[in-house]
Amino acid sequence: MSGFKCYLQLGDRLSQIWLNKYTLVLLLAMLKLLFFSKSIQHAIEVSETYILSNCYSIDSLYSKMTDNTPHYLGIMGNYLIEKGMEETVKATLETLSLIVYASEGLVNFAIDLYLGTYACLIVSAVDGTVDVATNITEKLISLVNDTVSSVANELDTGLNDISKIINKVIKAASKVENFFTGDDDDSNMTSSIKSVNLTISALHNLYIPSSINDKLEELSAKTPDFAQVKNTTKNLISVPFNEVRKNIKAVNASNIIGDTSVLYVPPVSLDNSTGICSSNQSEILAFYSILGHVLKIATVVCITVLICFAVGAMAPVAWNEIKLWRRLCGMRDHYMLSRQDSYTSFSSENTHELKDPFRDPPIQNGQYDVIASYQQCFQTWNTRIAGWMTNLVTFGKSPENIDPKTKQKIEWVVAYMTSERALCVLGIGLLGILVCICQFVMIALLKHKISHSLTSNDGDGVQNLLKSSTAVDIENQMSLWSVQTNKYINTTETNINQEVFGWINTTTLSVNNTVATMISDIDTTLADVFNGTLLYNPMKTVVGCAIENKLYTIEKAMTWIHDKAQLHIPRINGTQIKQALAKQTDNSTIPTASSTSAATENLLENLVNDMREGLLKILRAYHRITLGELTVALVILAVWLVQLPIALVILRLRLRKATFD
């Protein structure tokens, strides 16, 4: 037993190379691949079972999709046709109204162009003549009245002077006559002429009355102007056109398109004759059989490759162990040869006691081993675990009562079971067991939740949830479709108005600007030439009749074209479409609707039951997989426990060999 050590020798190390980390990883990968293959195989089987057990539901849904699609397409198509025809009639009536309005404008323009010009000139001539006569009369009356009054005043002044002279002459003659006759009787002829008073007071009352101007103004007021004549003519012409527009507005577009009930709507089919699943059941079975065969072959090939790599990984590990052991042995031999030169200065005078550099307590020379010190220094946890297990085995016994050889055997067996590779196996096994326990807890919680959540009562709630979810999804999709369609219509309408009618808008604006400039230039020219003269108003009237009225009419027509040259496309109303679908459903026969509802109820109930059963089946499958993983973890733990009999066998063989030696 002198050569027996408490640590593992090269042979002991090589006996555990199959527990190296590379081989373990590859073996675990192989097991993971195997479990993954089983999981896929189970999923394929569940899928096959689900499809075969729900063939009726699949056939029913497919039949509804294929057989009932014409029904809903018919409803949608009829609605679009109805709205399209109605909007077409409305657009036609609007176009007809615009044509009538344009025709009225053209007639008015033609009348204004030919007859209106002459009527305007005639009326303007009368108005101008009256205005000129009125102005001349006013000036003549003012001149005559002012002149006669002035002349009368001057004549009165002159006659007063003459009257004074004559009165003086008469007075002197009277005095001479009295002197010669001496007669104071005033009864004679001369006495009768006391004085002379010459006046023209009648001329002060001579004037031309202003009633003549009033007569002319009354004549001017009674003379109709061109605007009145034009409005009267326009009102007379607009009577038939207004009647036509009134009749057009009174037309009801809904009555013109006819009775929409004659539009055919394909009925809802309740016959699940289109059996896409039932008719192809043999092909479905063959397909799943091929999938299982391919999966099995792929699994076998991958596992074989991983096993080969796992076995091949032992060779480099064994070679590394041999090289490490050689280095340790070389270090030990080198230490044994140089220990006296290295540690003589630290020994006593009578002995050559050596000190272990890796331990604090003093030991005997024969007890020190470099390899043991190396393991204690660089494999700390392995050494500690080995010490704990040794103390556990020798529990209750003092170190002095244990035979040193027995202690070495125990330490060697513990070292064999707590080697780096053996502890790796132990850790993997314990970790696998812990993970499996966690998986069992999770599966139990999920199974409890499913069993108590998807009961019959809650199943109705799930069905209602599915119904409401389906209805909300359909409504959202319909709203999204209408919004996107309206966006497309908006873009198309904008492009048409810009690309097709854009040049019309540009042209009308340009023409209106040109007309406004021409009218402004004409008015400026007339003001520069005739302003302040009697000819300004007549010339302005003549130019207005001949030119400006036509320009104003053109400007008004261009503005009308600019406002009306716009395309308005009707928009999609999702609410009306939904109401049309609901109305069509209400108008359907009651047995058909109730049968469809009952079939839908059955489908939803089957869906809930299949959901519950499918979830439980998946949990059962994962329970089986977890059991397999737990078995693998226990096997790995058993592999570590197998190290004990292997260590005992090796120890037995080594002791027998030492006995023979």
Swiss-Prot record:
Record's note on what induces expression: By pheromones during mating, through the regulation by the STE12 transcription factor. Also induced in respiratory-deficient cells.
Topology in membrane: Multi-pass membrane protein
Signal peptide: none
TM segment ranges: 17-37, 106-126, 297-317, 425-445, 630-650
Keywords from the named record: Cell membrane, Conjugation, Glycoprotein, Membrane, Transmembrane, Transmembrane helix
Superkingdom of source: Eukaryota
The protein's name in its UniProt record: Plasma membrane fusion protein PRM1
GO biological process, any: plasma membrane fusion involved in cytogamy
Glycosylation sites noted in the Swiss-Prot or TrEMBL record: N135, N145, N188, N197, N231, N252, N272, N280, N490, N505, N512, N531, N573, N587
Annotated InterPro entries: PRM1
Location of this chain's protein in the cell: Cell membrane
Organism encoding this protein: Saccharomyces cerevisiae (strain ATCC 204508 / S288c) (Baker's yeast)
Phosphoprotein in keyword set: no
Family: Belongs to the PRM1 family.
Known function: Involved in cell fusion during mating by stabilizing the plasma membrane fusion event.
